[in-house]
């Protein structure tokens, strides 16, 4: 536990899968860059110019890659567009894209747009229960018409973790490129993108990496694709040594750096710079082990005290991500009532609560208190429904 490394919000914070709390090192890094701007003006670009590249070794450690295979840039959706513009090349029968019906909507928007643009279709792997996916169903949909498969490492609603290695290997054996959205896993567990043969991946840094709202996302391209020119070139992806020659000919940077497009936000990148320092002396294996301990405790407490609540997150460790999804009546109302009691969780329509005990800062005692309060709120909600008394309602505003 590194709780003292963070400026923790009041109460019990169980929403790190939406937005992690602010590390003190992130504040310090942003303030340092602000001072540079104030004191040096444009001359500070001498230091800022390759800031993203200097963060690549730390990013590489998070996802199991070499530094040249990763870069901090853009957002998840913008990076997905850049990857699709590069690697989605319909050819004869092999012209369709594959995703799942449980993917985060923004991914599906991007995938469908490229399929429509290039004359393909977006095929969706169905869920048997509306919460989880079967590996066998994913493999069965890796058919000869699929050019590229795009999948989440961890499902954003239920918290199910998919088998990246097995699915990637199966796709590769069938000549299908595989890409992954790792938004709900990076920072919560180790990854092996290079060794697993993942073709490309994206993720955010504002959840488990705690780099702040709108933090630069991450992008991975396996070095087996070295030499592939980005489909959405921009001047920040130009070879750094000759970028300011201002040539009209695009000469891509080495590796994933070529997929940068425009000038980055230095202040947002600075927050990421500070947030990554928190992980310098942390074992990702230890973070994962602690996460599983905490989610085990939470699931056991729910089983014991909340019999009317269904746990929709897999109980098997190998299939579980970092958050626990609870299905219950009046979930939206309950999530708001929790916040009134200084317990921050979140809601997903129509009836899911997501609670995230994060290894770096949450404790068993917090989980015990949260479930005790949940018990009180569920009892009160049942009484309210019995008397047809309305309660507060509001849409969620976080991912």
Regions found by a protein language model. Give the residues of each.
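Pyridoxal 5′-phosphate
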Residues: 1-399
